[in-house]
């Protein structure tokens, strides 16, 4: 299981029987028992509202660099969740991503940002401009951003899986940006769904 990427209780607890059977060759019944044991040990049931409030108190926010935008978002982009920015072509989604990458590094100086670029929109010169505007050294900020250019949906999925390896290698990844999450899937799976 470990060699197949199931190296935490959580990864086992949220797996399907079929995934464990395929990864390890165990029977369906054994996979079910392993998953149930992982779920039992993690206490993956309900929580009280008080428990949820305590968890919410530990949520941090990454500033956008704009006080007005931060106010609209309740203080910035929440950590620990997936946030999607969507809009028409040219509506500044990529600019938000670039600014957020710089602001993350400003807020967490030892952090790293992972940027999966599916439309060839990552612009290091724009990052440098945002860094200068934030009072940071552009070269240092650029060194803290890992960029992967995804050429199709399979490559995009591979890059997403490699983020786990980056974290395991000790990089303090605080932000993952995928620009654009759906572009390759829309192009490759036309008419499905």
Q: Which residues does each predicted region cover?
A:
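Small-residue hinge/turn detector
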Residues: 1, 12-13, 27
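The Walker A/P-loop phosphate-binding site
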Residues: 2, 19, 23-24, 34-140, ...
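Extended, structured, electrostatic nucleic-acid-contact surfaces
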Residues: 10-22
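Conserved inter-motif catalytic segment of the P-loop NTP-binding fold
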Residues: 108-193
């Amino acid at each position: 299981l470990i060699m197949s990427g199931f190296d935490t209780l959580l990864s086992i607890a949220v797996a399907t029987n079929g995934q464990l059977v395929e990864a390890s060759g165990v029977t369906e019944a054994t996979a079910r028992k392993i998953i149930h044991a992982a779920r039992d040990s993690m206490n993956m049931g309900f929580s009280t509202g008080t428990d949820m409030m305590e968890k919410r108190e530990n949520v941090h926010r990454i500033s956008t660099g704009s006080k007005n935008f931060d106010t609209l978002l309740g203080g910035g982009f929440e950590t620990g969740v997936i946030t999607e920015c969507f809009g028409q072509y040219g509506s500044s989604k990529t600019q938000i991503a670039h600014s957020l990458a710089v602001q993350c590094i400003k807020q967490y100086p030892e952090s790293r940002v992972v940027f999966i670029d599916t439309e060839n929109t990552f612009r290091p010169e724009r990052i440098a401009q945002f860094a200068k505007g934030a009072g940071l050294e552009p070269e240092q900020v650029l060194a803290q951003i890992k960029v992967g250019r995804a050429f199709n949906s399979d490559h995009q999925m591979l890059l997403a899986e490699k983020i786990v390896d980056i974290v395991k290698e000790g990089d303090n990844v605080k932000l993952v940006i995928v620009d654009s999450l759906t572009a390759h899937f829309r192009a490759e799976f036309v008419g499905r769904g």
